[in-house]
């Protein structure tokens, strides 16, 4: 589908899936912290889950549901347009977002496991190597590309001539 309302709802539904996944990560973290000296997760697993929770909440839920999903649904309506200026780019942006989620989840199953670098990926922690980190960084890059396309489409819709957008 290339209708902005459907794509906005797809963004929001997928972002809420990411929210539920981050909630599972949060439950794992809370289970580990429930009692002192708990051996539910190893230190490395705890850091991996913490990284996945933070990055999923920030990159895959808050930004996508709050800005992109809501924006796709509302921006053309606020401008009086039938659709966004580039509807196929809008659809591609959603599928790139979904692909980024799949890449991020796949990172857990590669040698070295999921990244345990924290959601900020700052230097002392981000010096970790392994295929999992590479896949997670590829997911973040794909997500950034998706966001760039989606937001450029919003700008193009806003700047479109009146007869082109309506």
Question: What is each stretch, according to the model?
Answer:
Residues 1-166:
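...captures the hydrophobic TM-helix bundle architecture rather than a specific catalytic motif
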